[in-house]
C-alpha cells in the first residue's frame, strides 16, 4: 500500500494516493495513519481530502477505504472528500466492489477533469 504524501493545511489535511509508477511513493504504515489522525484532531472542524494519483483505482481502493474507516473510527465527525478522475461509467463499474461501497457511503466522491491546454 503506497501513498505519495500527507499535507497539513490550515483548514484540512490532504492524503495523496500514489499514482501508478510514482517513484517517490512510500509504503503506508501505522505511523503514517497516526500522523494523519493527529493532524486532523488539531482542526476544529476536521476535513480530509483524498486526492492525487487515483484514490479509486484498483491499486488504491483498499488503502482509501482503510484510511477513511480508521479516521472515522477515531474522529467520527470528520468530513471526507475523495477527488477522482474516473468518469460516471467507470464509477458505476465499481458499485459491486466492497471497498468502493464503504468509501462511497462514508465520503463525498467528487469527479474532476483535467483541462487540456
Kindly label every feature range from the protein language model.
Residues 3-81, 86-98:
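Conserved Radical SAM active-site core
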Residues 94-117:
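Classical nucleotidyltransferase
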